[in-house]
Amino acid sequence: MKDFGFVKTAAVCPRVTVGAADKNVDNMLPLIKGAASSGAQIIALPELCITGYTCSDLFSQDRLIESAEAALGRLILECADIGALVIVGLPVRVRGRLFNCAAAFQNGRLVGVVPKSYLPNYNEFYEKRHFVSGLDTPCDTVTLCGQEVPFGNMLFCAGNGAAVGIELCEDMWVPVSPGTVLALSGADIIVNISASDEMVTKNDFRLSLIEQTSARCYCGYVYSSAGIGESTTDLVFSGACTIAENGGILARNERFERNGAAVYACIDIKKLEALRRNSEFYDNAARYADRDIRRVDITLPELRESDIDRNFDAHPFVPSDEKVRRARCAEIFNIQAAGLAKRIEHIGLKKAVIGISGGLDSALALLVADKAFDLLALPKENIICITMPGFGTTKRTKSSAVTLTECIGAQLRDIDIVPACTQHMRDIGHDMSILDVTYENVQARERTQILMDTANKEGALLVGTGDLSELALGWCTYNADHMSMYGVNCSVPKTLVRYLVDFVADERGGKLGEVLREILATPVSPELLPPDKNGKIAQKTEDTLGPYEVHDFFLYHFQRFGASPDKLMFMACRAFDGVYSREQIEKWLRLFMKRFFSQQFKRSCIPDGPKVGSVSLSPRGDWRMPSDADASAWLDL
């Protein structure tokens, strides 16, 4: 059974009765068992939840401390058939000192006790009145519930590669938290059992801390805080439960629930490992990790595929929220335009050349050039747009190209490549009735020759139009549309190109908006093969390759996180459930892998262009791969 690197976690908050340890265990049991039956492998409950956090001076009473230990023993016994790592909070007396602790157990066995390092003693908090810090423990083991177990900071290491660290409440709020050290020492999941009271705006700040901690440490973060039933003498606790991963919230509950709460999320530790490898994380770990930290071996229950409750965005390059998407489009558009403006300014040119096809990519390139020329205060007629109709050009795309150029106010030139291509095929002895790769590439290279030579003649920069998806699949002709003097779309995937063009259509409106909408409605095609008998596009890229949205999904998870082919299959089937069949997705994944490997030689020599997002295939930056690597291992699904 494969878990694909996912670990299912639960943040649970039971209702408590202050000082009544047995009642509190009674309330915990159904929540813990429910979480376990849902497939949770790690279950976190709040700080001091066995007694209640708000016992105050009752913590000095032997009866409370003894009842807490007895209640923990009963809880462990009644959860003997649960293999999940369960983490609960209680006071523990060690050699006369009282510690605020997290006890971890599974399969009826206590496996470790972690004391709180940083005790808040300001404003409403007076923990030092009752507890001592875990930064200076008198021993490294403790006997609790009749079991001698490790005591102090430690990592709980599972056979599936997961490593879990624990911190308590205030530990997260200090400049260098125990969780940070635990992450640098190998923890990919940090559990924080907490008792954080509520005040106006505090929840937003707390969520921000959780997000930032999971982002800084490239970790999963499971947070469970005290809730209903805690004393309201001076404070109110909401039972906030949150699970985060790498800066994003995976799950959180509605606070102030009256009868306990539980949230679940699967944390992708393989993804986190990839992010750590591709950053300075391990360099920092070499300097700041605790090399002497204890590692406690645990075994987590197997995660059933049906219990992986994670959803995957079918369009990871495109924010689903419209407001965020528009802001993202504006930022990308500005990056592209600034990159092009700098290159034109540096060379000292005043003109640009663009091949306009009436398709999406060339439309976006022209819009970027339009913006760049605004930045440089250059006249728009210095943008030379060239349409080059060939054997497959349709009236629709030709009309769109002309109208778009006119709306921008750029200079328009029309050069029919049919005579030159016909002569060239005669010269090389190619039968024009054979509509093969030679037939197509003759046209592509003729167009690039025209564009390059025009740029030389005019003292202009040839702006490339190819996008990231085409680079990934090698869907371009080597030394033809593959080549330019600066590629503004080189790190923009096809799915995002559509939204960028749509964004400009909305922003600018009018006749420009209308023609951009027409282009958006046009099938993606290189138009290198003749149109059908009705004069419509016959050669449709997605009929050959499969949907770009699926290939962009593969690209995002493969390049950024190193997702394996079987994991890509699993994720894509979830993301496109009800849209494409498993058989279709498998066919397209094999095609993606074959082309990604076989077409690397094109990516090894691509022009400069601006990086706009987290995924890029520039051989000078994000992706350096041999052109003759074998794809066999990646075709084994």
Q: What is each stretch, according to the model?
A:
Residues 1-355, 371-380, 412:
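Enzyme catalytic cores with a strong preference for nitrogen-chemistry domains
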Residues 7-8, 24, 160, 219, ...:
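ATP/NTP-dependent adenylation/nucleotidyl-transfer catalytic domains that generate, transfer
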